[in-house]
């Protein structure tokens, strides 16, 4: 199953016909620029660099930089992961001894697809320490660009009346060709480490390098043969296979992966469940831009959702809350399930509990007692995307879109609602 098949399970918010087209035909068609808070620079503890990268996953780029300058990659911090199939600008912090020596080493660094610019000193960066991202996206392959422009206007007009774009987690959370991350996450959550390993190592599409090796491993379970056949670029798969050969434990094999990588599986499953809840709310005709009794809403400050400041709507507070929603001071949320999740009541609460029942999961499972490093407390996430500075125009290449999104919000989900390509 590819991401188009996967996302066909989730409802569009607008009914207007999409414009089709293709994003990411070239890396320069998808440009991302990270925005971090100024408070990061209120320290001289670490070196702060702006990385420009192309055809590199964030974690792989950080490991390569650390290896070249001779430090542990754990001393390199970052605020957000960025797409490989794009040109991305993001910040990293380097916190270690002999910072001046490291600075000299970086000045002479030459890595294809990566450039680094020193921007100052600051605090160690951690995942989530960003405000958001600016995007520039070129949509190519349009049959009739002028008609596409008119359709875009119509879609945007409809979405404005409905409060924004549906805030689905994007394809990067699940995998674009092997859409399995959420399935691996569910198996890990249930403590089925062997099943999760077979899914991660053995699932194949039929048209990717390494598929024959995956297919053979799924059939035979032969670890020695897999180590001979799995290509070197499948470094995480190979790391797991080596660890399993050493320990005969798939749990320990998952634990050998870098923590940000292995947590992707649980995050992906949480994201799938959120998307399912959001889609069902749309399907049932419930507003995303008007609170219902029992809904949980989050505060909004300077146009940005404060996801950890939430309150439950009652019949008594309903009118007051919806006045705040209209003023842009609050937003209706959906569930990011975890062991400390606060579920909604009313119609949304019914949806949330139905999904937990359908999936056969208990919130306490997110404590991940067998592998506590994967524990997830959960939280809430706004149901709508309200892009800032949204602009678009026609060009020789196609349609060019520019906008800013808060952290954790996906540009691909904005484009999906306009393209409707699945």
Swiss-Prot record:
Keywords tagged on the record: Isomerase, tRNA processing
Catalysed reaction equations from the record: uridine(13) in tRNA = pseudouridine(13) in tRNA
Leading EC class: isomerase
Top-rank taxon: Archaea
Entry's EC annotation: 5.4.99.27
PROSITE patterns: TRUD, UPF0024
GO biological process: tRNA pseudouridine synthesis
InterPro entries to which the protein is assigned, alphabetical: PsdUridine_synth_cat_dom_sf, PsdUridine_synth_TruD, PsdUridine_synth_TruD_CS, PsdUridine_synth_TruD_insert, TruD_catalytic
GO molecular function: RNA binding; tRNA pseudouridine(13) synthase activity
Pfam families the record matches: TruD
Protein's UniProt keywords contain tRNA processing: yes
Keyword check for Cell division: no
Record: active site: 83
Listed Gene3D superfamilies: 1.10.1510.30, 3.30.70.3160, TruD, catalytic domain
Domain TRUD: residue ranges: 164-386
Transmembrane regions listed in the UniProt entry: none
Family: Belongs to the pseudouridine synthase TruD family.
Function description: Could be responsible for synthesis of pseudouridine from uracil-13 in transfer RNAs.
Matching HAMAP family: TruD
Database matches in NCBIfam families: tRNA_TruD_broad
Protein name: Probable tRNA pseudouridine synthase D
